[in-house]
Amino acid sequence: KTLQHKIKNMRKKSNFFHDNKPFLSLPNNDIEKGYKLLNKYGIEKKDKWICVFNRDPSYLKSFIKKDWSYHDYRDFPIDDLKGAINYFIKKNYFVIRVGSVSEGSLSISNNKYFDYTNSSIKSAFMDCFLLSKCEMFFGGSSGICLFTASFRKPYFLINNCPLEGIFSIKRIYPALFKRIKNLKDNKILSIREMVDRDLCNIFTSEGFKIKNVTNINNTEDEIKEFAIEALNILINNVESKDKSLNHQKKELFKSEIVRDSAIRNLEYENPIGSSFLEKTFIK
C-alpha cells in the first residue's frame, strides 16, 4: 500500500485525544526529579515555560540505514522561531527548546531561553516531564506532538505540510500551514489552485518536485504574529474563535478545502491562525 493510504488509515480515529481524558501522568517522585534537574539551569518550580520545537532532518538522519530525505519538505530552521521566542520571554515565560536531536543553535543571550536539546540533562524522561508541565507547545508538527496531546497540553503548530495534516485530528487550537509556490513562474498558489492541482495531500519531497512546486516556510514575522495569538488564547483560557477574522473569509476557506476529497472526510472545521489566514489567497 502507498504511504498516503497508510497515513489516511492511521487518521480514522481523529477525535481520540479530543474526546478522551488524559491517560498519561507522572508520579510525584518523578515530577520532583524533573524540577530538581531544571533547577540547575535556573528554572524553579514556580516558573512557567513554553516548549518550542523545529523539525529538521537530524533526528531521522540518526537512523543511518535508511534514506529519510522524503520527509525534508516538513523541515524548517530554528532561526525562524527567534521572534516568537523573544516575545514569549518578554511576557515572562521561560522558553525551552525540545527535541531529542537537532541541528543548529539559536543566538539568544537571555537566561530565560534554555536549549534543552543540546544540554546534558536530555533524556526520554525529561522529554516527558517538560511536555507534561509546560504551559503550551509551540512549533512544528512531528511525533513529539503526540506526547503533548497525551498530556492534554495546548499546542499550536506551525509549518504544517501538507495542508491535509492540519485536519488529521480534531483540534481546538489554531495552526499554520506552508504555502505552495509554483516553480515555473514563482507564483504563490491560492487555496483553490492547491486543491485544483491536488497539492493538499502529498507526503514526499519527490511528490512536490513531480508537481513542479515547492513549499514556503512560515516567515519569522508570521510565526511571531501567531505566537501573540497563541498566548492570547492561553492567557484568556478560551478556545480559538478567530474573533478578529472576517467570517466570510473563514467560510470561503472552508468552501475551498472541502473540495479536496480527502479533507472533506477529515476535521476541516479545525481553526487556522487568524492573521495568517487573513493574508492567504483563497481563490
Which residues make up each language-model segment?
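Short, flexible/disordered intra-domain loops and linkers
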Residues: L60-R74
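A structural signal for well-ordered alpha-helical segments within the folded catalytic domains
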Residues: D79-K82, F125, S142, L146, ...
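A short, charged/proline- and glycine-enriched loop
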Residues: I43-I50, R55
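Catalytic donor nucleotide-activated moiety binding site of glycosyltransferases and closely related
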Residues: V52-S62, I78-A124, S244-E251, S255
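Leloir-type glycosyltransferase catalytic cores
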Residues: K1-K40, R171-K283
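Hydrophobic anchor at the start of a short beta-strand
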Residues: W49, V95, Y155
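Surface-exposed alpha-helical segments enriched in charged/polar residues
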Residues: N39, K82-N86, F129-S132, I228, ...
